[in-house]
């Protein structure tokens, strides 16, 4: 896969703890995350697949891959953005996620959009 300036995707993330869906006594901590994918390049591109690495506070790692996001493979023209919200369940009060999207420009060039690590944490538990 290539990475070049004409194919540039920016990814911004916010996450929150969902107390009403969690069960602390059972070690079930539910988090929602909202992702903004922005095409900062100068060519249209489609999100083809996602690759996640999810790590809990005990160091347990789970890998998740799949086509598109939330059942879609959005195509973004330059200057366009796509937002979606999804969720993850951890067995600990803290963790992190990171990964990348496989993208394809309209000319068939494949490239990667990096998803930088972000924290999942129950409020008032981050050390």
UniProtKB/Swiss-Prot annotation:
SUPFAM superfamilies: ApaG-like (SSF110069). GO terms for biological process: error-free translesion synthesis. PROSITE patterns: APAG. Residues 3-127 form the ApaG domain. Pfam families: DUF525 (PF04379). This is Protein ApaG. The lineage of its organism: Bacteria, Pseudomonadati, Pseudomonadota, Gammaproteobacteria, Lysobacterales. The gene is apaG.
């Amino acid at each position: 896969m290539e990475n070049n300036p004409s194919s540039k995707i920016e990814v911004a993330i916010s996450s929150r703890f969902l107390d009403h869906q969690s069960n602390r006594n059972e070690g079930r901590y539910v988090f929602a995350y909202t992702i903004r994918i922005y095409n900062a390049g100068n060519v249209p591109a489609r999100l083809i697949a996602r690759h996640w690495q999810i790590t809990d506070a005990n160091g347990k790692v789970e890998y998740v891959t799949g086509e598109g996001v939330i059942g879609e493979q959005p195509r973004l023209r330059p200057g366009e953005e796509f937002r979606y919200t999804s969720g993850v369940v951890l067995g600990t009060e803290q963790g992190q996620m990171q990964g990348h999207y496989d993208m394809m420009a309209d000319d068939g060039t494949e490239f990667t959009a990096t998803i930088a690590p972000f924290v999942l944490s129950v409020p008032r538990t981050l050390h």
